[in-house]
UniProtKB/Swiss-Prot annotation:
Residues 312-324 have a biased composition (Low complexity). Expressed in pollen. Residues 310-343 are annotated as: Disordered. This is Agamous-like MADS-box protein AGL65. The gene is AGL65. One of its GO terms (molecular function) is DNA-binding transcription factor activity, RNA polymerase II-specific. SUPFAM superfamilies: SRF-like. It is found in: Nucleus. It comes from Arabidopsis thaliana.
Length: 389
């Protein structure tokens, strides 16, 4: 059975093209090597596989750069002549092999490409000449005596100014876009310190402090002096470390406060430093220093919350001591009317010279007289205990 003759046309299958290239590549490389040795010629063979892999071959005494330079020195006419000679030789070879190949198809494709490139070159040359003509008009305006020509120049100037204004407006909008984004984030309350941008935002981000509350909810506050004032803290609150750290006591050891006042304190104390209330009272400052007038009110509110939290923990400690040693407190003290209230910001000191035992309770309850949360001090006196003789 004879060998099937392959038609000279493009193979549709990718795998078939790769197999055919691999088989015939070795044959053409062998022929090129034999030709360079037998005829002692400068030869360069460069091929790319269907997958894009390059294969290059050159003679023993040949250099690829030298051969390409020699070919580049040929004139276009000489190149076309050599090309036609090669195609005629291929045509004779195909006729002997009974292959139907149209050589003019190869020539036509090449001629169309050259014609297209020639047309593009002509177009570019015409545009270049037009640009030179316009520039020559602007360099010699004093020599122009035609009114129509001057009108054309004026119209060209007007269009150029319009294009410049459009470009300027577009550039200005691109510059204002980051500022508008930052303003939008500020009004929507989304990460204001980061939205302001610049080095100041990074410093504010590093100065953020976390304030835990009794409900174990972490609340973030900026570390600005207008939010956490330390100016009068030592003189107003003796012990304030508990306001910044969570209590390590378990929940089952926290006793509920007896009486109606203690129940109110328990309800208000659990949510006094909640996330929602802090979000309403300690909002982020507006840009350009517009919250300077609100610093005093914020300081008063923060001090009130700190005092309330501090005194609640003192009450819890006293209640635990009462449970451990009930003999130190008289349960009839409250029934005998020994509890009275002292107005806010006033102090009362009672000295007992008859060896009466008294005990001070600093209980803080809301007061509606001041329009905000204020507190009254309650002193509870207990009569002395009779010692057994």
């Amino acid at each position: 059975m004879g060998r099937v003759k392959l038609k000279i046309k493009r193979l549709e299958s990718t795998s078939n093209r790769q197999v055919t290239y691999t088989k015939r590549k070795n044959g053409i490389l062998k022929k090129a090597k034999e030709l360079s040795i037998l005829c002692d010629i400068d030869i360069v063979l460069l091929m790319f596989s269907p997958t894009g892999r390059a294969t290059a071959f050159h003679g023993e005494h040949s250099c690829i750069e030298e051969v390409i330079s020699k070919f580049a020195q040929l004139t276009p006419q000489e190149r076309t002549k050599r090309k036609l000679e090669s195609l005629e030789a291929l045509k004779k070879t195909f006729k002997k092999l009974d292959h139907d190949v149209n050589i003019h198809d190869f020539l036509g494709a090449r001629n169309q490409t050259i014609e297209g490139l020639s047309n593009q070159v002509a177009i570019y040359q015409a545009q270049l000449m037009e640009c030179h003509r316009r520039l020559s008009c602007w360099t010699n305006i004093d020599r122009i005596e035609n009114t129509e020509h001057l009108d054309l120049l004026e119209e060209s100037l007007r269009k150029s100014i319009e294009r410049i204004q459009i470009h300027k407006e577009h550039y200005r909008k691109n510059q204002l876009l980051p500022i508008e984004c930052a303003t939008t984030q500020f009004h929507s309350g989304i990460q204001l310190p980061m939205a302001m941008g610049g080095n100041s935002s990074m410093q504010e981000a590093h100065s953020m402090s976390w304030l835990p509350d009794n409900d174990h909810q972490q609340t973030i506050l900026p570390g600005d002096s207008s939010f956490l004032p330390h100016r009068e803290m030592d003189g107003s609150i003796p012990v304030y470390s508990s306001c910044f750290f969570e209590s390590t006591k378990p929940e089952d050891q926290i006793c509920s406060n007896p009486g109606q006042q203690f129940e109110q304190l328990e309800q208000q104390g659990n949510g006094c430093l909640g996330l929602q209330q802090l979000g309403e009272e300690y909002s982020y400052p507006t840009p350009f220093g517009t919250t300077l007038g609100m610093e005093e009110d914020q300081e008063k509110k923060i001090k009130s919350e700190m005092e309330l939290n501090n005194l609640q923990q003192q009450q819890q400690q006293q209640q635990q001591q009462q449970q451990q040693d009930p003999s130190m407190y008289d349960p009839m003290a409250n029934n005998n009317g020994g509890c009275f209230q002292i107005p806010h910001d006033q102090s009362m000191f009672v000295n007992d010279h008859h060896h009466h035992h008294h005990h001070h309770h600093q209980n803080w309850v809301p007061d509606s007289m001041f329009g905000q949360t204020s507190y009254n001090q309650v002193c509870v006196f207990t009569p002395p205990l009779e010692l057994s003789r």
